[in-house]
């Protein structure tokens, strides 16, 4: 890996010396609503504002050099292009999404680095992850599947914080992240991206149009990620970062049809071999109690598509199927799990005057089986979970006048155990003029919990899992208020986007880490839980070579039970993002990006020597990029510039099987092995270098 890093470095120097820089070009777009002409030096911003206005999907006045847009809908939804995430290039979607204010990828284990995505402080189980609008990533697949979504297959990501459309159902309590994959018709004929770093990791992306004619196009892409370097900077005899060897193959077909009817389908296969644990662990130690290691093999297959029926009315069929198998050991604890999900949805859409009507029917069938008590009946016999959910929805987006738009939605789902589930949605957009937009949305949520797929702590064996009672479904009331202001300054403007959010939970299922140090006790909360807060984003939109984007979020997430208020774990009250970009005249650009977090409550044991709250910290990155006119692009930089590393993420790493817990002399406080304290990556300052190349 070091040799590859040196070769890439020399290659970039040679190309820089031989290829002449290109004069800066610009892309001029007219915004009629503001009567402003603006120029962008970003080559990636190829879609004209006129085209976007015709589609009526994008609020064009929010376009800037960060390639961030807002959907022109009563529901506040931000759209982030691939160019936005290239400001800090990463290997997968899980790491990339940290650049979005109010969205936090949370590492839940200091050993294997499983994680979930928090929106506005709510745990990852409350975030609905969609691919091309379909719930392909759920339950078991969220444990390690998020790191298996390579950025190379992503065209853009749509983020909705708070109540989303009734189309998405009742489980999207915290918000929705919709990953839109690349369109084979519009993709380059060939593209590749190779990135490596000084710690030995390598990420390879290759994409090629294998078919391209007047009727259809097919895009075949390969992503390979490898990290095999055992690093232990904090000297606790555990790997700081898990070793990973994964591959993802993606194939998408897009068809050209009469009257621009939609038709596409895609397939993806994903495999990963992941290990984290003691430095001396080897494959022969897998599943034994000789040396502690967490070894996970993941196999996953996805098939999904869209087909618009050849009818006068607009009927759109969405379909997907995914198979996910996990073969894992956490120390000597085996976890074997299989999940199969079938999803079908027929959508109807029609414009009647000022009303955009939508309706549809849905079937989501989930099969889940594992070797834990979660799929055992009262007699202790294996009983896989089979949960078909049938539903339908109605939605009316009513443009009352030029200033007011009202969205009314309702969804009904039938669950075989919990029966009828009703999910109303209301959203209102008020735009008195092009400079001010107010959005208000409200909805309810309903969610059934699977502890063994949603909470990694239930699997590690570091604590005994206790389920206190029959768990009831969680219910919530959610509301979101958004205000977008565009401040004109001569021929430019500044965007200010402020969002307030509030969620109230009944029957919230919580894990009690505090009552007994060797147990996690799960039960429905007798009281209630609340997530509330406010966030603000400020970004520039001008022709100057410097661009700024800054976001900050304040939130208060807690549960209240019998008069006691307990702050939620891993939910900092203050957090934010920053992005400073500068475009030089000779096709050089630099990006300073990062996130900052305030103190967050952490799972500690009684008399724990570690602080109950994390310190303030920031993860800062810097990148330098050089573009050439022949399709080459070279980039490199430094991650975690301030070298922040959490202290003591693992408790008693020298006794991972708790063989000496009862030794009062060496363990007077009764500490047990625990991996849940980690709150940030263990990788310190490090460098990266990459090369991109594409042929249109």
Model-derived features with residue positions:
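Membrane-embedded beta-barrel scaffold of Gram-negative outer-membrane proteins
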Residues: 314-328, 431, 439, 472-524, ...
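Flexible loop and strand-edge segments within Gram-negative outer membrane beta-barrel domains
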Residues: 19, 227-248, 256-315, 321-340, ...
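N-terminal periplasmic accessory domains that precede
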Residues: 60, 93-96, 115-118, 130, ...
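Extracytoplasmic beta-strand/coil segments of soluble accessory domains associated
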Residues: 94-135
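C-terminal beta-signal and adjacent terminal beta-strands/loops
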Residues: 548, 596-601, 626-696
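Gram-negative outer-membrane beta-barrel transporters
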Residues: 399-403, 501-504, 524-604, 692
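Short acidic/polar hinge/loop motifs at secondary-structure boundaries
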Residues: 118, 134-161, 249, 468
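Short, acidic, small-residue-rich periplasmic hinge/interaction motif at the N-terminus
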Residues: 19-86, 124
